[in-house]
């Protein structure tokens, strides 16, 4: 077994690549989609369900787990893997995005951020060092540094000041957790808003800190899709080829494939589970809204090309009935299917990269979602 942080590229097709990332709780094959388990669980999904659909890594959120039930409580239980019975790798976001989304409930300063809990209004302080301590208590395999995610309409002056702060925090994070300190990996986060020059500066300064991997943050925050993709394709090639690259909070199946095309390895998004709970399901024929009346007597599975438990067991008519009856089982079955679809998109991408036909594979998916 290679030491945590080892990353091997196994195949390339243009900038798209497959690889293997080693962590303390096992390997992660890339590209990979990470189901979001904000408070330690993927909504409506049990660990056995995740195993069954071949999920390799999930995401948790430092902010939410710190507030409830508390990182020290989780540490006393043996860490997040023991607490939530998920034995495979876990990545924890620093909570920066959630804190900065609080706007009126937080105050920024050089040392960190003061914020009030969205739960009970209690006052808390996150410093770069504190965020690392919390994540080490959680014992996540991949930790993220504290950063500020600016709004899409932030001007150059504010964005430049914000980037200086984010880099300052990244340096302090690296100081408190030097390379080789432990088995937890630490990723830096590229920021810089909508400005290429600032993102280039961010990449350069983060590379000097020699993180175990690099995330592209601050995209899909309200900017037009064309600008998001332009910044993605501009930023990703600047990151070290020998380290994993993570596009935070993005996105649709097509967004993910475009990210892979740009050379990104890791993705997370709440979209598959959130849409599942709203009745929107992804299939090999495009999106399907199970709430529609046309499915009331439809005995077909959601997707005849899908091997997930939901599709192999239940009809569209039954799933529609569950949804309209407000049965909680609908959330689980729909989520199993949507997560399976997203992971199958990833598995197909890996196969296409190895086979040298990734561009054609991406075009096939594009036809489903651009009509």
From Swiss-Prot:
Listed cofactors: Zn(2+)
E.C. numbers: 2.4.2.29
Active site: 93, 268
Residues at which substrate binds: 93-97, 147, 191, 218
Sorted UniProt keywords: Glycosyltransferase, Metal-binding, Queuosine biosynthesis, Transferase, tRNA processing, Zinc
Region RNA binding, residue ranges: 249-255, 273-277
Glycosyltransferase is among the record's keywords: yes
InterPro entries for this protein: ArchSynthase1/Queuine_TRR, TGT, TGT-like_sf, tRNA_ribo_trans-like
Pfam families given in the database record: TGT
Any single GO CC term annotated in Swiss-Prot or TrEMBL for this entry: cytosol
Gene Ontology biological process: queuosine biosynthetic process; tRNA wobble guanine modification; tRNA-guanine transglycosylation
Family assignment from sequence similarity: Belongs to the queuine tRNA-ribosyltransferase family.
Record's function text: Catalyzes the base-exchange of a guanine (G) residue with the queuine precursor 7-aminomethyl-7-deazaguanine (PreQ1) at position 34 (anticodon wobble position) in tRNAs with GU(N) anticodons (tRNA-Asp, -Asn, -His and -Tyr). Catalysis occurs through a double-displacement mechanism. The nucleophile active site attacks the C1' of nucleotide 34 to detach the guanine base from the RNA, forming a covalent enzyme-RNA intermediate. The proton acceptor active site deprotonates the incoming PreQ1, allowing a nucleophilic attack on the C1' of the ribose to form the product.
Catalytic activity: 7-aminomethyl-7-carbaguanine + guanosine(34) in tRNA = 7-aminomethyl-7-carbaguanosine(34) in tRNA + guanine
Keyword Glycosyltransferase part of the UniProt annotation: yes
Disulfide-bonded cysteines: none
Protein name: Queuine tRNA-ribosyltransferase
Assembly notes: Homodimer. Within each dimer, one monomer is responsible for RNA recognition and catalysis, while the other monomer binds to the replacement base PreQ1.
Positions bound to Zn(2+): 306, 308, 311, 337
């Amino acid at each position: 077994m290679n030491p945590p942080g080892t990353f091997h590229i196994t195949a390339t097709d243009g900038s798209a690549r497959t690889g293997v990332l080693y962590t303390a709780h096992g390997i992660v094959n890339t590209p990979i989609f990470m189901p979001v388990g904000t408070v330690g669980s993927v909504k409506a999904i049990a660990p056995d369900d995740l195993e069954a659909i071949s999920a390799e890594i999930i995401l948790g959120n430092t902010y939410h787990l710190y507030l409830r039930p508390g990182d020290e409580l989780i540490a006393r239980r043996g860490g997040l893997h023991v607490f939530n019975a998920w034995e495979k790798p876990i990545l924890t976001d620093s909570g920066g995005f959630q804190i900065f989304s609080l706007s009126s409930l937080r105050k920024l300063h050089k040392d960190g951020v003061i914020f009030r809990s969205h739960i009970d209004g209690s006052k808390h302080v996150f410093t770069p060092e504190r965020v690392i301590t919390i994540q080490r208590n959680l014992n996540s395999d991949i930790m993220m540094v504290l950063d500020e995610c600016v709004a899409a309409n932030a001007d150059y002056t504010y964005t430049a000041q914000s980037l200086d702060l984010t880099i300052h925090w990244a340096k302090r994070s690296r100081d408190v957790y030097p390379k080789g300190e432990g088995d937890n990996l630490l990723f830096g986060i590229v920021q810089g808003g909508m400005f290429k020059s600032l993102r280039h500066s961010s990449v350069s300064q983060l590379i000097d800190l020699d993180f175990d991997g690099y995330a592209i943050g601050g995209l899909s925050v309200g900017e037009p899709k064309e600008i998001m993709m332009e910044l993605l394709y501009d930023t990703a090639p600047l990151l070290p080829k020998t380290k994993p690259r993570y596009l935070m909070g993005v996105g649709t199946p097509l967004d993910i494939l475009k990210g892979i095309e740009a050379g990104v390895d890791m993705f997370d998004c709440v979209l598959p589970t959130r849409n599942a709970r709203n009745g929107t399901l992804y299939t090999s024929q495009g999106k399907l809204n199970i709430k529609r009346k046309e499915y009331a007597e439809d005995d077909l599975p959601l997707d005849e090309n899908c091997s997930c438990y939901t599709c192999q067991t239940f009809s569209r008519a039954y799933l529609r009935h569950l949804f309209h009856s407000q049965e909680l089982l609908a959330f689980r079955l729909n989520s199993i299917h949507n997560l399976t679809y997203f992971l199958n998109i990833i598995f197909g991408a890996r196969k296409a990269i190895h086979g040298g036909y990734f561009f054609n594979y991406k075009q096939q998916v594009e036809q489903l979602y651009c009509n």
